[in-house]
Amino acid sequence: NLGLVKINGLDVNTQLHFVLPKNFYLTAKVQYTYQTAIDVTDPADNYYGHQIPYIPWHSGSAVGMFGWSNDWMQYHLNYSFIYVGERYNQQENILYNYTQPWYTHDLSLVGEWDIHKAQGKRLFTLRAALDVNNLLSQDYDVILNYPMPKRNYKCTISITY
């Protein structure tokens, strides 16, 4: 548990959406965060004024989506890149507690279909997705000594009423 923490930062988000011919579209999103979160509990502590554990100064993401849609179905291919910058795993910001930055690349392919009654009213939406997470099979720990999975796959089928 921490006492007093002083937090300052900046968040920047942007999104572009392009409508292309023949029902195609392209979307791009970028997010960046700069954050200082320093312990200001007790000036006598060795870690007074240090960045608190596991809070990076820099982090961000980039997402791209290429898709196609019509009145009752859509398909899209998604790419995402997530970056978490250097940080420390304990209260003291010393070399021994330093934690390397990490990043991942992920891909997904999604299809969605609206299923209708004969009168045209939508009954439900069927969605199928195939995800490939950590595409480059990076070794990284979000928390020290808790390694995240290397490349992994997920297949999802869902129905929404």
Locate predicted features.
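Active-site lining segments that contact anionic ligands and/or coordinate catalytic metals
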Residues: 74, 102-106, 127
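Surface-exposed coil/turn segments at beta-strand junctions on protein surfaces, enriched
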Residues: 19-21, 55, 100, 121, ...
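Feature captures outer-membrane beta-barrel proteins of Gram-negative bacteria and organelles
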Residues: 58-66, 103-111, 151-159
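C-terminal beta-signal and adjacent terminal beta-strands/loops
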Residues: 71, 82-90, 110-161
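Exposed loop/turn and edge beta-strand positions of beta-sandwich/beta-sheet ligand-binding modules
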Residues: 8, 24, 58, 103, ...
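Outer-membrane beta-barrel transmembrane domain signature
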Residues: 84, 96-106
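Gram-negative outer-membrane beta-barrel transporters
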Residues: 1-87
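Extracellular loop and loop/strand-boundary signature of outer-membrane beta-barrel proteins
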Residues: 1-2, 44-52, 92-97, 140-145
